[in-house]
Amino acid sequence: MWGPGVTAEGLSVAPAPPPLLPLLLLLALALVAPSRGGGGCAELACGERERCCDATNATAVRCCKLPLHAFLDNVGWFVRKLSGLLILLVLFAIGYFLQRIICPSPRRYPRGQARPGQRPGPPGGAGPLGGAGPPDDDDDSPALLRDEAAAGSQDSLLDSGGGGRGRGGGGRSDPSCASEHEMRVVSPVFLQLPSYEEVKYLPTYEESMRLQQLSPGEVVLPVSVLGRPRGGVAAEPDGGEGRYPLI
């Protein structure tokens, strides 16, 4: 005698929702039914994952893949194309982390601070003009490498220039007596190449090549050449540019 949704006390109650199980079953059947292949198309027997398709020609009948399987095939093809790139990225990441673990970056110490196990220099000796302080802590910096290369070239110039002047009476002291600090801080302006008087008696390139081709017994030099001091001002025997012909 009571209508639906009305209780005995006269209060209205919402009707119960329909069960979800039948809806889920219908949805599953709708998804599975299109993916089920098989069967035949006139005289053709389609495979398990194929179905009959309408061709452009009404009389032609053919089998085609199901939409779900065609989509999965396209995804698999795309993943195979990217598999090489993905493998390279994974190998790069592994190598990077191994390099960071095996070869960590060196610690940077502030300028003037001694490393562990190194004696600190006296105050004021760690600057660019301090000769007794420790070298710059940043050993692998490009500026320090350039300074060391410049110091080596300056040392070679000092050796060649100072030695020639000492033998020729130029009055310059032996550069070996100079301290390492003086060699490092000396300005390139004061470094000069040997004078022409000191090197004009050296053989030319052609003469050097001829001397290398000749045996030691065939090379004979004048007595005046052997007795002439380097940088001397005696008269040149051939009247040329100070070079002696080979005899």
Curated annotation (Swiss-Prot):
Chain segments carrying region Disordered: 109-179
A Gene Ontology cellular component where this protein is annotated is:
membrane
What organism is this sequence from? Homo sapiens
| Positions glycosylated per UniProt | 57
Leader sequence segment: 1-35
Q: What is this protein called?
A: Uncharacterized membrane protein C3orf80
Using the UniProt record, give the first listed, main subcellular location.
Answer: membrane
Q: How does it sit in the membrane?
A: Single-pass membrane protein
Q: Where is the composition biased (Gly residues)?
A: 160-172
Keywords from UniProt, A to Z, are: Glycoprotein, Membrane, Signal, Transmembrane, Transmembrane helix
> Which Pfam family would be a valid example here?
DUF4719
Mind telling me which PANTHER family this protein's record contains?
A: HYPOTHETICAL PROTEIN LOC100362176 (PTHR38505), RIKEN CDNA 1110032F04 GENE (PTHR38505:SF1)
Location of the protein in the cell: Membrane
Which spans are transmembrane here?
A: 82-102
Xref: InterPro entries:
DUF4719
